[in-house]
Amino acid sequence: EGEIVAVMGSSGSGKSTLLNILGLLDGFDSGEYILAGEPMAGLGERAAAKYRSKFLGFVFQSFNLIGFKTAIENVALPLYYQKVSRKERNAIAMEYLKKVGLEDWALYLPNQMSGGQKQRVAIARALVAKPKVILADEPTGALDSKTSREVMTLLREINKEGITIIIVTHEHDIAALCDRTILLTDGLIV
């Protein structure tokens, strides 16, 4: 809890499977998963969605932004599903765009932004619902080394606020910026 952790391993080692289990997107056959003091085994989709919404934020290599929505609309989207009014969700989304240094880009579409800007919008979207844990799947994989360092600096700042961050990465220099690294081989932690 409160750490920034890298998960590394070769292709097929189980990194994505682990992230999907932690994100309550896939079930698991053995072991125990406790989130916020509650066991996660055997959750139905509705209960899993509730836990995801309340405790988890996701950041993906491909950003997963909605192309026809502006930066502020993309960031505000999780709040829409929480039934927050448009005025309030836009104000909150702008607060998070400021946090990631993109307040001037609020009305731009994803195709008008660089990869680093898109990733920062994705991070703001992950943060807007105030998760306890951020799950990041190759968050720097599509970025150049300078932008990767900027994104990692931002993630470290977020981590200092007490948010646990789990990063799947192939990049050793990214893992070196984390508190610890978990190595996976054939689905096992080594």
Predicted regions located by residue number:
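ABC family nucleotide-binding domain
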Residues: 1-184
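Conserved switch/coupling elements of ABC/ABC-like ATPase nucleotide-binding domains
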Residues: 186-190
